[in-house]
Amino acid sequence: MSKPTGSTSGCLDILNVKSSRILDIPCKVCGDRSSGKHYGVYACDGCSGFFKRSIRRNRIYLCKSGSQGGCPVDKTHRNQCRACRLKKCLEVNMNKDAVQHERGPRTSTIRKQVALYFRGHKEVNGSSTHFPGSSLPGPPFFTTVTQLEPHNLEMSSVATTPERQAIVGLAQPTPKYPHEVSGTPMYLYEVATESVCESAARLLFMSIKWAKSVPAFSTLPLSDQLILLEDAWRELFVLGIAQWAIPVDSTTLLAVSGLNSENMEAQRMNKIMAEIQALQEVVTRFRQMRLDATEFACLKCIVTFKAVPTQGSAELRAFRNASAIAALQDEAQLTLNSYIHTRYPTQPCRFGKLLLLLPALRSVSPSTIEEVFFKKNIGNVPITRLLSDMYKSSDI
């Protein structure tokens, strides 16, 4: 498979991490296996990346325990206290000047946004790149959920067609936060620009992985798959924010984006502020409904399988198999309706309320989401281009 040219070439490189990069020499900071010398010492990718970000952004951390260097810094505990981790980096003689004189990140590096995902999982699980949903299609949802919930849900009666079975099978229990992987809890969810940026990158990545995990989706023509994904990514992203409780307060988001009245014209700034408020409102409405994993999975299918694209020219974006797409959306709605009647029999209006919430997912423009969550890291590269390149990669 030929690699894309230009600024997208790095995207596939990040996805093709070779085990030969992992050495038997331990990381001087945490003791994990190093991937070579970084800033003068042998270090793992996690610690070298942490050191680079800390120095480049002039981070000042406070020790969580107040011991000023007494917190353990090893493979298991390295994420618990950033102050002690940075102190350990300096103690083992990581070179700050090497970071400052290093060539800065290029705005064309799409791979940085993808790397955020992998770095986050290395931080939690060592070198593992597994994340929720990677084993899909797995056991049917009704089998999994009966082992976790006190209610015995007869979901087998809902999944009466292959399409519905595929949709129901998507609703594997998912972590509360993108940082929480394979049962390993995130130590503290810190409302910091780094946390939000990495979470946004993971949401984008998992939207792609999720789409490729849907059997009915992958049977559509590739051109239809790409149109659907490019059209629905905004709604999938907002649903992910609601599902995983990512902070959307204006102070945090403006810090994430680096936007302010000094570097942006007033009219554009006012539009972004209005859309941040709209994002807060729609996320609040979804969280008030307290959706479970199955409902989120069905809603993702409903917003993805739109037979008429909501973005762009209909002439330029005509589907090759619009009837199949429409049928899949019908199946997703029927599945959600049947599930709600089974799971929430005392809430007869719940299905209608959830459907009425879906248009609100489009109250935030794709351009604002790109500007706030991604532009600082990937520059002017369109998200749709990133989505297309990543989706076509055989490594995902």
From Swiss-Prot:
Domain NR LBD: 153-394
PROSITE patterns listed in its UniProt record: NR_LBD, NUCLEAR_REC_DBD_1, NUCLEAR_REC_DBD_2
Segments of the chain annotated as binding DNA: 24-101
Predominant location: nucleus
One of the Pfam families matching this protein, by short name: Hormone_recep
Positions of disulphide bridges: none
GO cellular component, one term: nucleus
GO molecular function: nuclear receptor activity; RNA polymerase II cis-regulatory region sequence-specific DNA binding; zinc ion binding
Family, as annotated: Belongs to the nuclear hormone receptor family. NR2 subfamily.
Subunit structure: Monomer.
Protein name, entry field: Nuclear receptor subfamily 2 group E member 1
Gene name in the database record: nr2e1
